[in-house]
């Protein structure tokens, strides 16, 4: 019986890097992992149309706030997005508000455990070739399917956009009650090569869900960018 492994975790240290870059004591590790997840989930939920490709989180050593003289944990959050304007807005005040909202998100849990408060440093970076990202392709399909566009038409539109990204291969799978069918099924399409068993293959992967009037549809995208030597 075939066993499946996550395409990104399978290639960590070869073609993929960790999304969270920090070290911690064994006792603090679970809490910090959950804190990272909370920050990421909040950003993806708050900016669904920003086409966020990736969020990298780095943590510095605990330092002292110059004004309050209290200990603070500094967290660097780098957001890679295709549409920076959706996050930045028209003024710098938007970024300040975002930083404050993210700090408040973690503040209550830290107070319960008597831990230092956090200071977030935000960096927003524009991605030049967004449709080479599996996450952006999945977001585009979600938008189409939630607007009741037939799944085959949505796949065709997505493949047209992917051609401009010059990927070496793409595989897309959609599962659920497709076009409102009584029985759920899976449909997939593949263009080019997608060598999932080759470790040196630079493959981006994303799995997301679309909420339609017929129920939830699962979307999986594998994007093959080439082999690393």
UniProtKB/Swiss-Prot annotation:
Keywords linked to the UniProt accession: Chloroplast, Plastid, Ribonucleoprotein, Ribosomal protein, RNA-binding, rRNA-binding
Signal peptide bounds: none
Record GO cellular component, one term: cytosolic small ribosomal subunit
InterPro entries linked: KH_dom-like_a/b, KH_dom_type_2, KH_sf_prok-type, Ribosomal_S3_C_sf, Ribosomal_uS3_bac-typ, Ribosomal_uS3_C, Ribosomal_uS3_CS
Cellular location(s): Plastid, Chloroplast
A Pfam short name: Ribosomal_S3_C
Annotated GO MF terms: rRNA binding; structural constituent of ribosome
An example Gene Ontology biological process: translation
Domain KH type-2: start-end pairs: 39-128
Family under the similarity heading: Belongs to the universal ribosomal protein uS3 family.
Cited HAMAP family: Ribosomal_uS3_B
Subunit structure: Part of the 30S ribosomal subunit.
Record's protein name: Small ribosomal subunit protein uS3c
Native source organism of the sequence: Tupiella akineta (Green alga)
């Amino acid at each position: 019986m075939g066993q499946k492994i996550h395409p990104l975790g399978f290639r960590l240290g070869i073609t993929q890097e960790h999304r969270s870059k920090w070290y911690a004591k064994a006792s603090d590790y679970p809490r910090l992992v959950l804190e990272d997840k909370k920050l990421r989930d909040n950003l993806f939920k708050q900016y669904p149309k920003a086409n966020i490709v990736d969020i990298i989180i780095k943590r510095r050593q605990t330092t002292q706030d110059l004004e309050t003289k209290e200990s603070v944990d500094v967290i660097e959050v780098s957001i890679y997005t295709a549409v920076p304007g959706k996050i930045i807005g028209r003024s710098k005040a938007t970024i300040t508000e975002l930083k404050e909202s993210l700090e408040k998100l973690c503040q209550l849990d830290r107070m319960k455990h008597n831990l230092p408060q956090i200071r977030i440093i935000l960096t927003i970076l524009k991605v030049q070739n967004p449709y080479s990202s599996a996450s952006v392709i999945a977001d585009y399909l979600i938008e189409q399917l939630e607007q009741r566009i037939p799944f085959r038409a949505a796949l065709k539109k997505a493949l047209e956009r992917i051609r401009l990204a010059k990927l070496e291969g793409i595989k897309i799978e959609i599962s659920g009650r497709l076009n409102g069918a009584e029985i759920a099924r899976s449909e997939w399409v593949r263009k080019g090569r997608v060598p999932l068993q080759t470790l040196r293959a630079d493959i981006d992967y994303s799995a997301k869900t679309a909420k339609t009037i017929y129920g939830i549809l699962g979307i999986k995208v594998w994007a093959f960018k080439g082999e690393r030597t």
